[in-house]
Curated annotation (Swiss-Prot):
This is Probable GTP-binding protein EngB. The keyword Cell cycle applies. GO terms for molecular function: GTP binding; metal ion binding. Keywords: Cell cycle, Cell division, GTP-binding, Magnesium, Metal-binding, Nucleotide-binding, Septation. Signal peptide: none annotated. Its cofactor is Mg(2+). Gene3D superfamilies: P-loop containing nucleotide triphosphate hydrolases. Residues 27-201 form the EngB-type G domain.
Length: 205
């Protein structure tokens, strides 16, 4: 597989979709970003691309209800999935969304990898584990980013990373776990390197 290095600073907004069935055709390579409503997903995308307002951040958890697609280069897309697990969303909507999310992860042919973001202080909640299960069952590689790592001391951070790495072993999937902080620039290089690796099959053809 040929090694590539994409310039994520050139990433731009492509389109928004109200649901999984409305996203553009299944071509190129997509990498999806998922996480609980307060996991810092938009902040991570902005840090990766070095753009303050590429993905809109909100003080109100659950604000991102649309699926937002961003283009790194033609045929290379990042997909920002709506935050899950927000209490104020009606139960029926939650159930419907979780069902379509599972479908997307398991049936989308151009999906090359999944980045799951979790607050380092509260990792592996039920829905996080559900996302991991779906991805593993679809043979999809996963990068778990433990966000807000700057909130912990270095030793506490290392302990949490070790704990999560051990906790995910039973899933038996291709799962990498890294600490991440947009504020302190922790893990941004590892995120970019993983995306490069996942995007590379198209370059190798």
């Amino acid at each position: 597989m040929s090694e590539i290095k994409l310039n994520y600073h050139k990433t731009h907004f492509l389109t928004s979709a109200p649901n999984i069935r409305s996203i553009p055709e299944d071509t190129g390579i997509e990498i999806a970003f998922a996480g609980r409503s307060n996991a810092g997903k938009s902040t991570a995308l902005n840090a990766l691309t070095n753009q303050k307002n590429l993905a809109r951040t909100s003080k109100t958890p659950g604000r991102t209800q649309l699926i937002n697609l961003f283009e790194v280069e033609p045929n290379y897309k990042l997909v920002d999935l709506p935050g899950y697990g927000y209490a104020a969303v009606p139960e029926q909507m939650k159930i419907q969304w979780q069902k379509s999310l599972g479908e997307y992860l398991q049936k989308r042919e151009c999906l090359s990898g999944l980045v799951v973001l979790m607050d380092i202080r509260h990792p592996l909640k039920d829905l996080d584990q559900q996302m991991i299960e779906w991805a593993v069952s679809a043979d999809l590689p996963i990068l778990l980013l433990l966000t807000k790592a700057d909130k912990l001391s270095q030793s506490a951070r290392s302990k949490q990373v070790k704990m999560v790495r051990e906790a995910i072993l039973p899933f038996q999937g291709d799962i990498q776990v890294e600490a991440f902080s947009a504020q302190n620039k922790i893990g941004i290089d590892k995120l970019a390197a993983k995306l490069d690796f996942w995007f590379s099959p198209l370059f190798a053809k």
